[in-house]
């Protein structure tokens, strides 16, 4: 149809569709709950668009009626997706775990409010357990769930970091107030900073409705101004003491800035953690080796070199500091599996190549197991290349292929031969490991 002669109703519907399309990324990425302000805003916009679509006059014309129907269906699809994101069972699971963390903070964070820095083992263990459970919430690669899990995890990890930083400091300071008149003021500021830690944690966890990030930021900035105004008369030990307290305040201000920017930035980005960076560097090299192996025309000559380097990567992962952080533990666990499955792929390929070079008489059941191992080798090559989620056709196909191999192994009768029994057992374990790896790959981990 000539754009110049396009019916006004069609033009209006196209305009509404453009507006709906523009808001789609916000709907797809919505990671909150149905009582969030942003949920209500998106719901209101989409509902308004539906009313706008409904009010377009079709004049009884079929093409306009079809265009209006398509526009309404697209808008209704986004409304449904918004509702599903907010009410997804795993989103509710994330929120329930976060509520447990809130209850723990309310119950155990009193020492911070009183100006001390005594945190019970029960609190530390509770936070560790909560973070670990969050890392195991399945997202199925869904953007909204990954975002919700990431946001919740990083908030709680920030709380853990604030607490651990406070616990490990234990300086020889504060100084005696007899040393210099300024020391009394620095000591009182340090007490205020300890209290501010408790307030910050309560803010991060959403358990203090009487305080705001902005107000606490002003209070902390005021404390820095008070410290800057002190005359320390060139006394090195007092100047160092003041510097330590200022550094503590600046750390707390950093968390406040991140919390205020949380909706628009990668707040508390665990990806900047030095242990995570080490893990990422290992994974980067592992992917390079994997691509080289999967693309090689004649890979056998690469096997030994690749396997030696991969075993070295496992050694590097063993040296990564976990820092008592379950997120780092989970990241390392996944990285170890990624490297180990590639070593398994190489071992299997090598074994199959050797069998071709040195054929021998085999018991029929044993031969059947080897044929299945050959199938598993091909499937594992595909799984290593797979990068989708559980809804992908390729995921379903690979899962079905692996299940068929397990059924085929179950049907093999070793006829009492021990060697065949052991081979079948090993093949079953391999198929199960590939299935587990496929499951892990489809639930992409984010820091």
Curated annotation (Swiss-Prot):
One of its GO terms (molecular function) is protein kinase binding. Keywords: Chaperone, Repeat. InterPro entries: BAG_chaperone_regulator, BAG_dom_sf, BAG_domain. Residues 9-86, 95-167, 182-260, 275-350, 365-442 form the BAG domain. GO terms for cellular component: cytosol; inclusion body; junctional membrane complex; mitochondrion; nucleus; perinuclear region of cytoplasm. SUPFAM superfamilies: BAG domain (SSF63491). Pfam families: BAG. GO terms for biological process: Golgi organization; negative regulation of neuron projection development; negative regulation of oxidative stress-induced intrinsic apoptotic signaling pathway; negative regulation of proteasomal ubiquitin-dependent protein catabolic process; negative regulation of protein refolding; negative regulation of protein ubiquitination; protein stabilization; regulation of inclusion body assembly. Binds to the ATPase domain of HSP/HSP70 chaperones. Binds PRKN. Interacts with HSPA8. Interacts with JPH2. Co-chaperone for HSP/HSP70 proteins. It functions as a nucleotide-exchange factor promoting the release of ADP from HSP70, thereby activating HSP70-mediated protein refolding. Has an essential role in maintaining proteostasis at junctional membrane complexes (JMC), where it may function as a scaffold between the HSPA8 chaperone and JMC proteins enabling correct, HSPA8-dependent JMC protein folding. Inhibits both auto-ubiquitination of PRKN and ubiquitination of target proteins by PRKN. The fifth BAG domain is responsible for the interaction with HSP70 nucleotide-binding domain. This is BAG family molecular chaperone regulator 5.
């Amino acid at each position: 149809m000539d754009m110049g002669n396009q019916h006004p109703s069609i033009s209006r519907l196209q305009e509404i569709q453009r507006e709906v399309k523009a808001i789609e990324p916000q709907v797809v990425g919505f990671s909150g709950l149905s009582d969030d302000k942003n949920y209500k805003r998106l719901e209101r916009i989409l509902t308004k668009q539906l009313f706008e679509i409904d009010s377009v006059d079709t004049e009884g014309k079929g093409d306009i009626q079809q265009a209006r129907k398509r526009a309404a269906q697209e808008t209704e699809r986004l409304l449904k997706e918004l509702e599903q994101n907010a009410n997804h069972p795993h989103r509710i699971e994330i929120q329930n775990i976060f509520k447990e963390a809130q209850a723990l903070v309310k119950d155990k964070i009193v020492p911070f409010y009183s100006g001390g820095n005594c945190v019970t083992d029960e609190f530390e263990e509770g936070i560790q357990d909560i973070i670990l459970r969050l890392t195991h919430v399945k997202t199925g690669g869904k953007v909204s769930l990954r975002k919700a899990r990431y946001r919740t995890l990083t908030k709680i990890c920030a709380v853990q970091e604030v607490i651990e930083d406070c616990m490990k400091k234990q300086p020889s300071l504060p100084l005696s107030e007899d040393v210099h008149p300024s020391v009394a003021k620095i000591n009182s500021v340090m007490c205020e900073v300890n209290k501010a830690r408790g307030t910050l944690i309560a803010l991060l966890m959403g358990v203090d409705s009487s305080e705001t990030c902005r107000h606490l930021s002003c209070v902390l900035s005021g404390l820095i101004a008070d410290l800057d105004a002190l005359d320390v008369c060139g006394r090195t030990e007092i100047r160092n003491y003041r510097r330590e307290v200022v550094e503590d305040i600046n750390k707390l201000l950093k968390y406040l800035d991140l919390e205020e920017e949380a909706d628009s930035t990668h707040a508390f980005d665990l990806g900047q953690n030095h242990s995570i960076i080490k893990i990422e560097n290992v994974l980067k090299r592992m992917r390079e080796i994997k691509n080289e192996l999967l693309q090689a025309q004649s890979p056998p000559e690469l096997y030994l070199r690749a396997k030696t380097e991969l075993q070295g990567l496992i050694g590097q992962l063993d040296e990564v500091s976990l820092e008592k952080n379950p997120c780092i533990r989970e990241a390392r666990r996944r990285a170890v599996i990624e490297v180990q499955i590639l070593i398994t792929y190489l071992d299997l390929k090598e074994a199959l190549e050797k069998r071709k070079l040195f054929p021998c008489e085999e018991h029929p059941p044993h031969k059947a197991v080897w044929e299945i191992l050959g199938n598993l080798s091909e499937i594992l090559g595909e799984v290593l290349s797979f990068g989708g989620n559980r809804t992908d056709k390729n995921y379903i196909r690979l899962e079905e292929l692996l299940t068929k191999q397990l059924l085929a192994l179950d049907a093999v009768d070793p006829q009492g031969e021990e060697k065949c029994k052991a081979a079948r057992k090993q093949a079953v374990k391999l198929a199960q490991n590939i299935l587990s790896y496929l499951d892990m790959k489809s639930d992409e981990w984010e820091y």
